[in-house]
């Protein structure tokens, strides 16, 4: 009988990778050796997903029901590690093997929508109800805070009293404790990892408060935000308590306790200095954080098993080196004199059994962080390269199509959308300076990100507040020059599928010929119109500055501007789109080329829109967004 290690690990968010994305599945092949965990999964794809999120798994092998006579080994999923990144393959009829997708960017997802017919996924049955379809059963599971997977007996199930029964289930490891072939039964998983739960979530972090109840895991993390992300992707964590690095008990400092309860909420909480508590974000709708953490922690050392030590120039290069190395989970970059040669210093690449540091030390001459290979972008830049494919003549956008787009709203006696903007970093938004004409007070502004429909915004919708408005020093009201401003948010944003930064162009990027450009916003659909509810998009060609100058003979079109529009008109940005993005796709990457600034009317014939040219302001953007430790806080692929 095979021994399955249920719940002896939890999903790590900062896992190792091999170099390059390998998606090939090997039929009739089984990897020999290297086992780090085993479980039951309904197919090879789900087994691969579990491998992708496991801290040590690089390879997997799966045994379908048809591949083996031993009932206890059917649907067996074996997760494997290897120092070299590969293992010997042996022939096994029906077996399927493959690689982790940690290195595969946008293919990284914990969402699994498939329905499996003719199988019963076993676990702890905690809720039974009558429903009319398997889809309704899956929806109930998704809307139940404890449900991980389900089974549904169809109308043709052999026992009439069980027909249309929907069984909600969970297990210690989040996967079935057994899978049995059973006619007229359909099974599947909760869609909470798809950000489709209707439960709602608590995004607040509670300072100096400790939650009670059952601990399901304990890890070391540098801050409460890493703790929360780990909780979000742990199969049984519903809330957490984090003990800071100044907690009174030294052995408990930086401990992140992942917790659960029967009710789904803490049964009690206790005021405690230097503790921080919060909730899993798995039940958030459309706002799940990415399963990675990009922040670098200066003055901090991460301890763990040593993989390699190499000399590199700068902490960012150290993080990139960790990200590219086959098994690196986290790193420390040392600035000790004895660890440096000329301009390069030692980069310590490390790993652990659970993907988290085994020790965290403060007040050092090092900087530490995590591998970025579970970031969905799939490259060293956090800014996104993905979309699905004041807008006049535009069409409706879809969820996640333009994840950098934000709505700048003003709340005085009433609240209204005023301008657009572009997310360029965890704490930075780029927009037009003229949006703040007459409204320079930061307290009246609310920044909404990760939204599609303005009508979805209610008094309970989370928003960002402004910490600082930075308007270009040469901007003058009622003039079109230097129409650019930065917004620093009071708190950093988590990146999600619907909320990611746009890449910035290279400094002085004037030679690139862009042919696939889009403008987005909620602005008027005609000159004398009204704000649109659904985010609009329009594909629009760039116009040379020489041609643009001919159309605006009473104005000066400078090299710091870029124009776009159709000669015949009909499609353009308009009122309410100001500050929003003009983005262009080049070599597979979206870049913020312009900021919606001004124009003569909206979509008029031979009157192109004028945009602030972002490439001409890269020095200014870098200067203003540079942090105290010298790490740029916006996202640029250059």
Swiss-Prot record:
Quaternary structure?
A: Forms a heterodimer with SERPINA5. The zymogen is activated by factor XIIa, which cleaves the molecule into a light chain, which contains the active site, and a heavy chain, which associates with HMW kininogen. These chains are linked by one or more disulfide bonds. Interacts with iripin-3, a serine protease inhibitor from Ixodes ricinus saliva. Interacts with iripin-1, a serine protease inhibitor from Ixodes ricinus saliva.
The protein depicted here goes by the name Plasma kallikrein
The subcellular localization recorded is: Secreted
Q: Which GO terms describe its biological process?
A: blood coagulation; Factor XII activation; fibrinolysis; plasminogen activation; positive regulation of fibrinolysis; proteolysis; zymogen activation
UniProt disease annotation: Prekallikrein deficiency: An autosomal recessive condition characterized by a clotting defect due to prolongation of activated partial thromboplastin time. Affected individuals are clinically asymptomatic.
Record's InterPro entries?
Answer: Apple (IPR000177), Pan_app (IPR003609), Peptidase_S1_PA (IPR009003), Peptidase_S1_PA_chymotrypsin (IPR043504), Peptidase_S1A (IPR001314), Trypsin_dom (IPR001254), TRYPSIN_HIS (IPR018114), TRYPSIN_SER (IPR033116)
PROSITE patterns the UniProt entry points to:
APPLE (PS00495), PAN (PS50948), TRYPSIN_DOM (PS50240), TRYPSIN_HIS (PS00134), TRYPSIN_SER (PS00135)
Residues at the catalytic site:
434, 483, 578
Show the catalytic activity.
Answer: Cleaves selectively Arg-|-Xaa and Lys-|-Xaa bonds, including Lys-|-Arg and Arg-|-Ser bonds in (human) kininogen to release bradykinin
Where in the chain are disulfide-linked cysteines found? Answer: 21-104, 47-77, 51-57, 111-194, 137-166, 141-147, 201-284, 227-256, 231-237, 292-375, 318-347, 322-328, 340-345, 383-503, 419-435, 517-584, 548-563, 574-602
Q: What is its EC number?
A: 3.4.21.34
Pfam families recorded for this chain? PAN_1, Trypsin
- Activity regulation statement: Inhibited by SERPINA5.
Q: Which UniProt keywords apply?
A: Blood coagulation, Disease variant, Disulfide bond, Fibrinolysis, Glycoprotein, Hemostasis, Hydrolase, Inflammatory response, Protease, Repeat, Secreted, Serine protease, Signal, Zymogen
Give the recorded effect for residue 548 to Y. In PKKD; likely pathogenic; may strongly affect protein expression
Tissue specificity statement from the Swiss-Prot or TrEMBL entry: Found in plasma (at protein level).
Main subcellular localization, coarse class? secreted
Q: Name one GO cellular component term.
A: extracellular region
- Which GO MF terms does the UniProt record name? serine-type endopeptidase activity
Q: Source species, please?
A: Homo sapiens (Human)
Function comment: Participates in the surface-dependent activation of blood coagulation. Activates, in a reciprocal reaction, coagulation factor XII/F12 after binding to negatively charged surfaces. Releases bradykinin from HMW kininogen and may also play a role in the renin-angiotensin system by converting prorenin into renin.
What is the residue range of the signal peptide feature? 1-19
Ranges for domain Peptidase S1 come to 391-626
Q: Which residue numbers delimit the Apple domain?
A: 21-104, 111-194, 201-284, 292-375
Encoding gene, per UniProt annotation: KLKB1
């Amino acid at each position: 009988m095979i021994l399955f290690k249920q719940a002896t690990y939890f999903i790590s968010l900062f896992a190792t990778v091999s170099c390059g994305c390998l998606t090939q599945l090997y039929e009739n092949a089984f990897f020999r050796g290297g086992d780090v965990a085993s479980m039951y999964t309904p197919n090879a794809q789900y087994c691969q997903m579990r491998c992708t999120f496991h801290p040590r798994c690089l390879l997997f092998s799966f045994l379908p029901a048809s591949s083996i006579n031993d009932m206890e080994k059917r649907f067996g999923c074996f997760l494997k590690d290897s120092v070299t990144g590969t293992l010997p393959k042996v022939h096994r009829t029906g077996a399927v093997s493959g690689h982790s997708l940690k290195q595969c960017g946008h293919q990284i997802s914990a969402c699994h929508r498939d329905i499996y017919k003719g199988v019963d996924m076993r676990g702890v049955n905690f809720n039974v109800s009558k429903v009319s379809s398997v889809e309704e059963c899956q929806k109930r599971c998704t809307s139940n805070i404890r449900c991980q997977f389900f089974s549904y007996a169809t109308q043709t199930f052999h026992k009439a009293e069980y027909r249309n029964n929907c069984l909600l289930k969970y297990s210690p490891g989040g996967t079935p404790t057994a899978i049995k072939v059973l006619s007229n039964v359909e099974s599947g998983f909760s869609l909470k990892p798809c950000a489709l739960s209707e439960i709602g979530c608590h995004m607040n972090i509670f300072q100096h408060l400790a939650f009670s109840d059952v601990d399901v895991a304990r890890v070391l993390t540098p801050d409460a935000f890493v703790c929360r992300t780990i909780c979000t992707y742990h199969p049984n964590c519903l809330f957490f308590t984090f003990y800071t690095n100044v907690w009174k008990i030294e052995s408990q400092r930086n401990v992140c306790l992942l917790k659960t309860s029967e009710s789904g909420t803490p049964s009690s909480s206790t005021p405690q200095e230097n503790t921080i508590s919060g909730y899993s974000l798995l039940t958030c709708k459309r706002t799940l954080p990415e399963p990675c953490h990009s922040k670098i922690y200066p003055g901090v050392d991460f301890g763990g098993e040593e993989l390699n030590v190499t000399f590199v120039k700068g902490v960012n290069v150290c993080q990139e080196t960790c990200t590219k190395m086959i098994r690196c989970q986290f790193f420390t970059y040392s600035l000790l004199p004895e660890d440096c040669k000329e301009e390069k210093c030692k980069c310590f690449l490390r790993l652990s059994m659970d993907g988290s540091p085994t020790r965290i030390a403060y007040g050092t001459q090092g900087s530490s962080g995590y591998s970025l290979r579970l970031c969905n972008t799939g490259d060293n830049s956090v800014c996104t390269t993905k979309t699905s494919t004041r807008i006049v003549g535009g069409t409706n956008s879809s969820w996640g199509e333009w994840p950098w787009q934000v709505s700048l709203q003003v709340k005085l006696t009433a609240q209204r959308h005023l301008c657009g903007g572009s997310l360029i970093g965890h704490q930075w938004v780029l927009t037009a300076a003229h949006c703040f004409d007459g409204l320079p007070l930061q307290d009246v502004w609310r920044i909404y990100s990760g939204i599609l429909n303005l009508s979805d915004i209610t008094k309970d919708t989370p928003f960002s507040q402004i910490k600082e408005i930075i308007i270009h020093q040469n901007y003058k009201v009622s003039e079109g020059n230097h129409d650019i401003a930065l917004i620093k948010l009071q708190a950093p944003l988590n990146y999600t599928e619907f909320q990611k930064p746009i890449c910035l162009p290279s400094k002085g990027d004037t030679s690139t010929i862009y042919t696939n450009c889009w403008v987005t916003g909620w602005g008027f659909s005609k000159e004398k119109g009204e704000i649109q509810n659904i985010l609009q998009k329009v594909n629009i060609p760039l116009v040379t500055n020489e041609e643009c100058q001919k159309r605006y003979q009473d104005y000066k079109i400078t090299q710091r501007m870029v124009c776009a529009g159709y000669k015949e008109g009909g499609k353009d940005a308009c009122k309410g789109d100001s500050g929003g993005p003009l983005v262009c796709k080049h070599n597979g990457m979206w870049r913020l080329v312009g900021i919606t600034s001004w124009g003569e009317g909206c979509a008029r014939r031979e009157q192109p829109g004028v945009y602030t040219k972002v490439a001409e302001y890269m020095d200014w953007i870098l200067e203003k967004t540079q942090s105290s430790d010298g790490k740029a806080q916006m996202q640029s692929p250059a």
